C-alpha cells in the first residue's frame, strides 16, 4: 500500500512539474520566436556573425550579447 501511494505521488509530482514547465516555456512560443527572428531581414547580417558560444534562441549574435524580453518572449541581439 505504501509503495502504491509513493508511486502515485511521484507520478503526480512529475506531471505537475511538466505542466508548470510547459506553461512557462511552451514549444509553440519558442518556434514562433525562432521563425520571427529568422525572418527578420533587417538584423540578418548582425545575427550571422557570432562570437563562439553566444546565442539568442539558437540564433547567433555578432557582439555575443542577447536580450530576451520576458513580457513578450521576443529575443533580440544587442
Curated annotation (Swiss-Prot):
The keyword Metal-binding does not apply. Residues 1-23 form the signal peptide. Disulfide bonds join 49-62, 56-66, 61-77. Keywords: Disulfide bond, Ion channel impairing toxin, Knottin, Secreted, Signal, Toxin. GO terms for cellular component: extracellular region. It is found in: Secreted. GO terms for molecular function: ion channel regulator activity; toxin activity. The keyword Signal applies. Residues 24-47 form a propeptide. Expressed by the venom gland. Putative ion channel inhibitor. Belongs to the hainantoxin family. 20 subfamily. The presence of a 'disulfide through disulfide knot' structurally defines this protein as a knottin. This is Hainantoxin-XX. It comes from Cyriopagopus hainanus.
